[in-house]
C-alpha cells in the first residue's frame, strides 16, 4: 500500500532542511505543525495522517536531546506477496527519480533486496530512501546526525 507519494518525500525533506537545526526534542512540536504533523502521547512520535492506523514519524535523538534523524514509512507491502513487493520496488524507483530531479544524483545508490538512495543536502543534512520486500522508509538525517553517513 502506497501511503505517501514521492512528492510528499520531496516536500517534507525540503521543508526539514529549512529548519534551524539543532532542534531539541521538546522544541519540535511547532516545526512538526509546519509540516502538518500532529503530536501523539509520545514526545518522539508525530502523526502524519488523520487516520491513526497509518504510520507516525519517529524522531531519533542524541544524548543532548537534539534530534539527529526522523523515520517515516512511505509504503508498506501489507499483502506480503510478490505483487506487493513489485509495487514497493516501483514506488522506490519513483521516489529515487523524484529525488534526482530535486537534488541531483544520490551519493549512495544500492540495488537489490534492500535498495537505498541517499542525498547530501545543502544544510549538512541527508535524505535517504530505503526499502525491502515489506516496506519503504524515508529517513531524514539532521546535521547533528551527520556521523551516520561518515
Residue ranges and their predicted role:
Residues 1-113, 123-126, 132-150:
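Short helix/turn-capping signatures at newly exposed starts of structured segments
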Residues 118-119:
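Long, hydrophobic, well-ordered secondary-structure blocks that form the structural core
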Amino acid at each position: 500500500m502506497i501511503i505517501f507519494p514521492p512528492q510528499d518525500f520531496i516536500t517534507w525533506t525540503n521543508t526539514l532542511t529549512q529548519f534551524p537545526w539543532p532542534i531539541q526534542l521538546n522544541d519540535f512540536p511547532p516545526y512538526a505543525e509546519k509540516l502538518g504533523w500532529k503530536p501523539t502521547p509520545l514526545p518522539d512520535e508525530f502523526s502524519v495522517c488523520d487516520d491513526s492506523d497509518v504510520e507516525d514519524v519517529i524522531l531519533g535523538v542524541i544524548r543532548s536531546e537534539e534530534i539527529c534523524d526522523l523515520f517515516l514509512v512511505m509504503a508498506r507491502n501489507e499483502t506480503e506477496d510478490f505483487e506487493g513487493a513489485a509495487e514497493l520496488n516501483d514506488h522506490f524507483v519513483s521516489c529515487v527519480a523524484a529525488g534526482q530531479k530535486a537534488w541531483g544524483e544520490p551519493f549512495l545508490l544500492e540495488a537489490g533486496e534492500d535498495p537505498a538512495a541517499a542525498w547530501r543536502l545543502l544544510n549538512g543534512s541527508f535524505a535517504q530512501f530505503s526499502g525491502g520486500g515489506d516496506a519503504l522508509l524515508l529517513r531524514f538525517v539532521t546535521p547533528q546526525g551527520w556521523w551516520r553517513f561518515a
